[in-house]
């Protein structure tokens, strides 16, 4: 008599095994790869000295230029699409290997700090800057001054670069 219920249960188990509920991990999904969530939007923020005046802005290009009185130095805040190597090359005219930037990994973005020398119509320039890369966009803040004024403003440049970060645009 005990054999009949056991056989009935065994048959029931064998016939109902195909009726299992799929877990979320096993479920098939169909999605449009282009319809994922939008990447986060960031803004580059920096604590600039009150003496700096905005001398130019091109919001279509994502570029703002600040100068200290009498043109002692210039700060440019700019966004650019592309890989950090290409943006650094465009910004400085040098390859990344020649710049040997200091790389810092942050949760929101990778940061590259760099320095270089250059020249313009008025003479030799001392330049330094930072680039933050969120995976799609480069946010740059280079500082340029006459080479003979570099020691005068070195502490101010260090403070500006130390307080440069990405913040949510929302």
Show where each model-derived region lies.
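Serine/threonine-rich, low-complexity intrinsically disordered segments
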Residues: 6-9, 81, 119, 132, ...
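Solvent-exposed loop/turn segments at secondary-structure junctions
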Residues: 82-84, 120-121, 146-149
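N-terminal targeting sequences that direct proteins away from the cytosol to non-cytosolic compartments
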Residues: 2-64, 69-70, 144-170
